[in-house]
Amino acid sequence: MNILVFGKDGQLGKAFHVLVDALLPTLVNAPNIQYVGRSECDLTDAIALNNLLNQFQPKLIINASAYTAVDQAETESDLAFAINARVPEIMAQYAVKYGATLLHYSTDYVFDGEKYGFYLEDDLRNPLGVYGKSKAAGEQAIAKAFSKGSREGQYAIFRTSWVYGDGRNFIRTILRLAKESEDLQIIHDQFGVPTSTEWLAQVSLDFVMDAQGVLRRFPSGIYHAVPAGETNWHGLASFAVQTALEFGASLKIAHDAIKPIPAVEYPLPAPRPMNSKMSTDKLHRIFEGRCDMSKLDLLNQPWDKAVRSYVHNLAKDGLI
């Protein structure tokens, strides 16, 4: 089986690389995997992307690529839509035509954040900024491509939020600032769930493949994929700083000295949803139907467990 993983240079793509490299020796029939980054294919070149798909002929496409510069997207809408909408559309068209499986990633930014409680997969999209609009367009393009039917093709769109991993992210930024300053002010009235790329990659592979590396069948559609619990940006920052101090990091600020502020006091070019909490009941039902309790344990893992492990590894590697 051929597998194409797009976005190899991003946080999620790197997590897939590490996970799959560890998994391959355990498989009897190991798949042929190619990781694709900017040096392998310019995703804005539709001809080049189609040529790559047709030449490699993947049975599984994992699209971990994305334009994620939320504020910059406000002035680069063409590029944001090219990568976040047109690229998944081309991948979906290939999957429909050749009976492949497409695993694509989307975001909480497709919602306006005005709902009370947890968003469901079929709640109305109402993105506030260009980034969210481009990701919503990608979701719709995939669904439209598959709406005509495909004998073997299937797709899953994993909506996730507040992603962090090997690369630039909120947690690493906060820890860097905590080394430089005794004064930190962090937004306290935007809520969501921090999601580790390591966690997300593992859940993704468990969803699409069995223990032998054979592709699973599943109902095509959107699935929310985040760990258990919820927090706000101030809560995440405080927990990250507290954890770093526990592991011996030299910081200039204590976790309880971080000042909470409302979002209106920290204006940004692109608006953010105030509520990014998403229900994962639909994803849970898939794993419950497979009677795989170990996978359910991973789904039920609280967000702070992975954050603690992440910060510990940063401290151990001297990156704080």
Give residue ranges: language-model regions:
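Adenosine-cofactor binding site in Rossmann-like domains, unifying the SAM/SAH pocket
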Residues: 24, 29-51
